[in-house]
């Protein structure tokens, strides 16, 4: 692995859309007791179910600590799931792993963003996060991929979505938050995104979902489903704190034009719940200094948008909610050529995210 001093755009590389063919998906095995209840056993079962669902469509590599390696290997009993030993601080590989970029000549490289646990000393969710900031480099070394390191520029993979044709969508709530890159203006942040993802048009939604502890990651709220079309989490309940957020996002999306000059088609998918952790679920989390508080009174940021597109499939969360069926129907309508697989997502949600947050796709290189 070589750490390059150029940028992907200078070298002809770009971030492809999630629906482009994958060579595999990456995950990290959960274990920290101050985030995952009951010593992470329920979360590990949930992660294993997600990995096995993905493995129906493409290979999966799961990174597990030395302490957890044998347990992970036993739980992930599928020939298409590889387990590698890797230290980390937590299991959110969407945010700690590399953003892979490709060119039109069979090349594959990775962008290694600086990671600060969603806010560092100003609202970050745990300390220390040094091992998580090294996950992207370790994955790139395993894959013999050259690396672009954005030293000092903080970004998580869950805060961006691209259409593969030059358009990126994100939220002001996250990328303009003072706990990410306070030294940079919006224009300077856009310049980094344009250079490292080779995008030309950036759509800024004001907010993500209410109470999203990542400061409003877009991957829990709105995503591209194909060029010119997005899927937006939605509520018609004016008393829901997400109502104003949905309305504001819709106003932006209706005015927006993508990099090809297209107006966007916006599909809506309902927001489940309101969902809350139970007293018992919160009691199973070990309270440690510097970690995120788990409280039954705090609404969970549940979302059906937090799914992963894989080769021929959609791996989406179900919550045991009355809206699960409607969400599955909408996903089947929006992705008619994909097999929609709903996987229990509550345990992942209790830790602060969902299926898209715990996965990172590795695109398959190709020659145009």
From Swiss-Prot:
One of its GO terms (biological process) is putrescine biosynthetic process from arginine. It comes from the Bacteria. Gene3D superfamilies: L-arginine/glycine Amidinotransferase, Chain A. Pfam families: PAD_porph (PF04371). It is an enzyme of class 3 (hydrolase). Coiled coil: none annotated. This is Agmatine deiminase. It comes from Stutzerimonas stutzeri (strain A1501) (Pseudomonas stutzeri). The gene is aguA.
